Amino acid sequence: MKLNLRPAEECTFDAVSLGEVMLRLDPGEGRIRTARSFRAWEGGGEYNVIRGLHKCFGMKTAVITSFADNEVGLLMKDFIEQGGVDTSLICWKKTDGIGRLCRNGLNFTERGFGIRGAKGCSDRANTAISQATPEDFDFDYIFKNKSDGGLGVRWL
């Protein structure tokens, strides 16, 4: 298999990912069901890869995702930006404030300890990205080279 890299000068990003980014809530050393406080993180399979490419190799990366347009969505955007990943390709979805239109995904993960394995559960029903359509993102513009009027992505 041949890796096809576009010239860097033709591309805004080295790599992008498409997928759900959830708010990860970590109860520390305790259990989810008894915790009274949680540490918040961002996470998601595709996003974790793109963040790692930026952090480990200094690549210019972006995430293509969708969030409910509310304070939790803005918090997740801020977490992504703190990780050095570009957020300009996020699609913001209207929300009604109670989750009927859309919401942001939540992931609860407790750490393994000794012989007890890690445990987690996700609350992903009706999330903004699950309702996204191809029309929500201009893929032609994202993947077209800069000289052709697009953003350009090196890795295809």
List the predicted regions and their residue ranges.
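A short alpha-helix capping/helix-coil boundary motif
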Residues: 27-31, 54-60, 147-151
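A generic fold-level signal
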Residues: 10, 33, 44, 101-103
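Conserved N-terminal subdomain of the carbohydrate kinase-like
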Residues: 60-156
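Gly/Ser/Thr-rich beta-alpha loop segments that engage phosphate groups in nucleotides
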Residues: 21, 45-47, 154
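Positively charged, low-complexity intrinsically disordered leader regions
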Residues: 1-37
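Short secondary-structure boundary/capping elements
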Residues: 14, 41-48, 133-134
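Alpha-helix C-terminal capping segments
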Residues: 41, 48-60, 82
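Residues at secondary-structure transition points
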Residues: 37-44, 71
